[in-house]
Every structure is written in C-alpha cells, then in structure tokens.
Amino acid sequence: MSYHDSSDGLLSDHLRYDTRVFPNTRAVTNALLENGLLTQARLILLDSPLMVATAFTALSFQSFTNQHEQGPEKAFQLSWWFWLLMTGLGLGTTVSIKWVGLFTIAWVGSLTLVQLWVLLGDTKNVTPRLWAKHFMARAFALIIIPVGFYMAMFAIHFLCLVNPGDGDGFMSSEFQSTLNSKGMQDVAADVAFGSRVSIRHVNTQGGYLHSHPLMYPTGSKQQQITLYPHKDENNLWLLENQTQPLGINGEQINGTQAWDNLPEPVFIKDGDVVRLYHTPTFRRLHSHDVRPPVTEADWQNEVSAYGYEGFEGDANDLFKIEIVKQKSLSPVSKERLRTIETKFRLVHVMTGCVLFSHKVKLPEWASEQQEVTCARGGTLPNSLWYVEYNEHPQLTGDNVEKVNYRNPGFFGKFWELQKVMWKTNAGLVESHAWDSRPGAWPLLKRGINFWGRDNRQIYLLGNPVVWWSSTLAVVVYVLFKGIATLRWQRNCNDYANTTFKRFDYEIGTAVLGWAFHYFPFYLMDRQLFLHHYFPALYFAVMAFCSTFDFATARISLGGIRNNPVINRVSAVAFLALTIVAFVLFSPLAYGNPWTKAECNRIKVLGSWDFDCNAFHDNVSNIDAFIPGRGMPERGL
C-alpha cells in the first residue's frame, strides 16, 4: 500500500504536468517539489489516490474543453467522446475515494453549464435538436457514468467484504445479518410470558441489553446493566408476568419455569407489565431513585440487576410494555409483542421513567460498555427497543410462525452505508491536537504531526514557496478580475485581445476549482486538517502556472514580453527557490535525521509547531537511520 501511495504521488504530478501543458506553462515543476504531497504519498492514506483522480479529472475535462472549443461541427467525434467519457470516469473515481470529489463534480458541472449556455445562444450553428444532443451526451457522461461507477464500487465492496469486523457495529441489524456468522436462524414471531429473549436498542448501533456479575462502584452498588454490541449469553432475559401463573387446578405455579407448564402460551400485549429475569445471574432488571454512576442528571435513574436465585423480586422490578405503533412494522406487531417487528419502550411502573441508553461509555470497571439508565425524558429513539432472539418451549415446530431480518438488498445496504458515512463524518466534532481551520490553510499556518521517535519526526507541512505563491496567484486573479470588470463596464475592449481572453478563462477556471474545493469547508463543524486543502492547492498551483505564463506573455515592462532569456531566467530562479525550500523542509517529510539548529533556522512562522527540541544537538549525535523502523500506520 505504501508503494501504491508513492506511485500515486508521482502519477498525480505527471497528470498535473499534462494538464498544464495546454497553456504552455513554465512553472509546473513546483508541484513535483511540494513537501506536503510528498509526505502524504509516503504514508498509507487516501489523499494520494484522491489527488491522482482529481488531476486525471482535470486533465480529461481540459482535453474535452479543447475539443469543444473547436466548434460544434467537431463535436461527437471519437476524441470528443473519449475525453468526455474519461471526465465522467474521473468524477466517479474521485468521489469514490473521498466525498471531496463532490466538489470536483460541482466544478465540472458549473463549467459544463457554461458550455451549454454558450451553445444555447449560438442559434446560427446550433439547432435545438443539436443542443439537446449535446445536453444528453453530457448528462450521460457526467451524471450517469459517475453515479454508476460510484455504485459499482460499493457493489464490489459488498461482494468482497462478507465477514464481520470492527466497523459492523455502525450498521443496522438487517445489514449485519447479511454478513457471515452474523445471520441467525428463523425465530418464533410471537413473544409470550416465559420466552427467553435478547433485547436490542434501536438507536446507537443496536447494542444488546446486557448484565454481568460485576457491581457498580457507587450508587446502589448493585449488579451492572449495560449495552453490549456483541452476541453473548449474558444478553438473555426471561420475560415474566408480574405475578406467578395459575395452573389448571387454580393453584399458583412457582419458579422461573412456571410459564412452560401452561396449556398454551400467553402472548405479551401492549400495556402488559413484565419482569425481566437475567437467567445467567438469577437477578431481575431493576430501577430506583438513585443517580447513575456516570450521567448524574436529576432526570436519570440508575438501572441495575437485583436479587438472587429464588428471590421473588419487588415492585421496582416491574416494567410496562409500551408499543410504539408508528415504529412497528405490521398490524399485529402494533397490538402484541412480536420478534423484530415490534418497537417498544419499557416504562418503570414505580417511577414512570423509561429504559434508556445513549452514546456514553462507562469506565473501565464496566469494560467501557455503554451506559443504560432509566430516563424521565430523553429522545424517543434512545428509549426504543425490540426483541431479536426469542425462544419458548411451546413456540417450536413447523406450525409456529417464524420471522427473521429482511434482506435489505443492494440498494438498501448502499443507502444505509451512505447515511452511516455521513453521520460518522459529521460526528467528528471533538477537538484534535493537530486540527486546523480553513482560514489557516492558504497561508500554511500549521501542519500535522504524524509521527515522532528516536529524535526524528514526520510532520506534514507544505513547501512554503509553492503554497504562498499559489495563494498569491489566487489573490492576484481576484484583483485582476475586479479591475478587468470595471474596465469592461467603462467600454475598455480588453477582451477583444485573444491572449487576454484565453488566459482569463484558464486562470478563472483554476481559481473556480480552488474556490469549489476550499470554501465548503467553512460550512463544516467537524474536525479538519491541513490535508483537506490539497485538492484546492492543486487548482491554486494551476492558477499560479497560468498567471506566470500570462505575466510573461503580456507584461512589456523591461522587455519581458519580447525577451525569452528573461522569461527563462525568471522560471529557473523560481524553480531554484522551490528546490531550496523543498530540500530544507525534506527531513520533516522523510523522517530523516536533523539537528535542533537546522530545525530552528527554517521555522519561519511561530505557528509551525513541530518540535525542534526532539532533534539532536549536533550532527555527531545522529546515529544510523533504519528506514521504516517504527513508522506510523495511522491516518487522519
């Protein structure tokens, strides 16, 4: 994988060069000497393939644009179709790697709309039928192909990844049931008194109501109740009536097996009061007016397992079944308790609180399992439960109705995974030691510490020459465009000049790409890092290259426009400056030996928080470096 990412880094530079060949740029080499891209390419991270896909998409669309600009009569030829289809393939690849590809789609889409608008106004050469043909071709290539490719990647994903793993807890029970060893046998549909059941939480990735022979260290110090994400015998509960059943002779039948001896099962209905007996530890689900050990809110009560073998229980063991009809699947499941189909709440009879769980982890004394409380409030999804496993001696055989999870199919799994991905990304809101906000990215105010060991450090930081020159190019273009617009309003005929018009379009499209890949991050509250700026940096570098070419082609000051020697010298000087910066900062990219003095010498900004004290005092203290030793395996 590391070799693959390194190859991606080289390939993205090659594609970037090919993209800029069209305006005959002389400064593309700065992309080859970008320390931040190099650092990412050396680690197993998504950003290197993302940059390859972004560069390929930009190259393909630029090539298609060149075909398009040859005129309507050149449309629909083989090369026209090739580059249009390659653009669609690039968009599909980009968005399949990271959702940042949606910004690339927006960039291509906006420029495509401009093309269609211009064609619509060309009534002399473009008939309505021909325009519709252009529209349909672009819709197929730039919408159908990317969407199809994106969905195909998930189809391959589902075919290859058929075993459960650490991440399957994020998915619904229906999704998990399609994984190997996660499926279950058909179980009895109706739930009766005496059923041995496992109860799952609807929200928070569906953990099981669980208990184990460990006590709370505070509060009542009774046995813990938690939410546990895996199947386990400690998830099994026996559903008892609030009173013991009566036999045929009218006498009370005692014991936890009493309901097995009835002539026929008694189904549990909406409003019935039950007790939940934990069969492995002989205790019952219990709640009382005691604060929980972690969430010590007044509206939360502790939930515990209380009692011992042979103990008849007390009133605090009683819970009422409250079926939530709008969440239950079938008409029958709205009236009585049904496996999987019925969604219900467990209301504590004595206090009126509702069995509740949320994404709060208990400490190590509870194996960091999820907290379960009894809440007088809280959101409905966090108090919803359903029965997954259901066993009863009188509900066996082929004549008993059975149920199982429905197979969600490809589209159901695909859509659920999109929602989980969105929710997981949006949930990354906690502060991180190395995060940064978008306002700091264009000026390279802060990097990311990836790894440090043995007086060496890998710290993601871009080449300042590349970053600051590309940011300057964006600022210069904005000022240039503002002045050009004012001159155009005063009837100055700048756009009659072909060179002026051409470079305005080329620089403008690059700056537009930068804007699409940069400004949306201001709307995000999640954790953000410097590497999120890389796609925008790609377009900013393209803007700088075009700006450099435009300046050398248009500026007559000092004979620059007519003197190729000056042009070459300026290009070589910039290249030399870029190389010097690359070499100076390369120890941070490669994790090479370094000294404190060398580190402090290149620390231009105080906000660059790589630790110079981690390096040796002088060269004589640097021992032989073992490549790859202790290298990081984590990403951001």
Report the location of each language-model feature:
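Lectin-like carbohydrate-binding module/patch detector with strong preference for beta-trefoil
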Residues: 158-416
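Hydrophobic transmembrane alpha-helices of multi-pass, membrane-embedded glycosylation machinery
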Residues: 105-115, 535-538
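Transmembrane helical bundles and short interhelical boundary loops of multi-pass, membrane-embedded
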Residues: 22-24, 66-68, 78, 83, ...
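Transmembrane-helix signature of polytopic, membrane-embedded enzymes
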Residues: 1-35, 51, 71-82
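Membrane-interface alpha helices of multi-pass inner-membrane proteins
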Residues: 14, 41, 75-78, 82-98
